[in-house]
Amino acid sequence: MELKDVLLAPIFAVFLYVWAYLRRAKQTNSLTKKYYFLALNLRMFGAIALGFVYQFYYNGGDTYNFFHDSLIIWNALLDKPDVGIQILTDTPGTLNPATQPYTNYMYFYVDKSTMIIVKASAVLGIITYHTYLANAFFLAFFSFTGVWAMYRAFVDIYPMLYKRFAFACFMMPSAFFWGSGLMKDTLVVGALGWAFYGFYFGVIKKQKILKNVLILIAALWLMQAVKIYVAMCFLPSASIWLFLQYRANMKVALVRALMLPIVLLIALPIGLLTVSKLTEGTRYSFDSIGETTKTNTEWNAVSGNASYSLGE
């Protein structure tokens, strides 16, 4: 972080808080209103804390490496806009003579999932004059909107548990620390919240179906692009929920009894095919999962199980 973080980040923070304030009436009710800005404050604090820990304790690390790569794209956009746009639109790892003077200096150019956060930071840099803390604030705000959307869905299902849901969604230190800064986890947390919201209101409750299904699709795309295993966990759970919802509405007992084995016979091969297609070319594919497990086991043996990872 630099002097411009101190000068510019507060301006963008004020903008985000004003935006949140203008939307509060539509996003809250009499029970949840008091948690709205608490949730946002914790996300913003998490963004600051993560940056400080990585800068002053670790002297660098993932978040600053992501920022480093996004700075290269931002500089390309300033120097040669057509080349910068090409970097943003090229498939990561593409050997393009026009972009190589920039991409050769990027740490994560060959990593498709990591380039999502790198590109997001570069695009935000157009607005924020590529200021680390301002970029982190925007990402934290996205995470906040997703988590708040999920909280609204939870409260709609179990209104009397609004206090417990508030604690679970907003106040867990590890969640608002790791899910608020310039990290891949921030995008995934926000996307997961929006996916749950879109699925519940669009598919289960059938409210504003088109809008909510589009939200669901966009959130699922982002999840699978950044951390595919999160989407792999969400989709089966959502499918089971949907099946149980329809099964409960069936009036004939025999039909209800026969539905489970029939659905399992259909769902298992479709599920396996879907997972295979989703993970194709990643280290979570059926062909690579054994090697991934072996690598993780060897690393844990070397580190004495002392390593920490949020996944790739």
Positions of PLM-derived features:
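Transmembrane-helix motifs of polytopic, lipid-linked glycan transferases
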Residues: 18-22, 123, 135-157
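Extracytoplasmic catalytic/substrate-binding loops of multi-pass membrane glycan-assembly enzymes
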Residues: 54-69, 78-98, 108-120
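Loop-to-helix entry region of an early transmembrane alpha helix in multi-pass inner-membrane enzymes
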Residues: 108-119, 127-145
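Alpha-helical transmembrane segments and terminal signal-anchor/GPI-anchor hydrophobic tails
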Residues: 221-312
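Transmembrane and membrane-interface helices of multi-pass
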Residues: 166-172
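Membrane-interface transmembrane helices that cradle and orient dolichyl/undecaprenyl
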Residues: 156-158, 195-211
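Short acidic/glycine- and proline-prone juxtamembrane loop motifs at membrane-interface regions
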Residues: 181-186
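Membrane-interface alpha helices of multi-pass inner-membrane proteins
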Residues: 176-177, 211-231
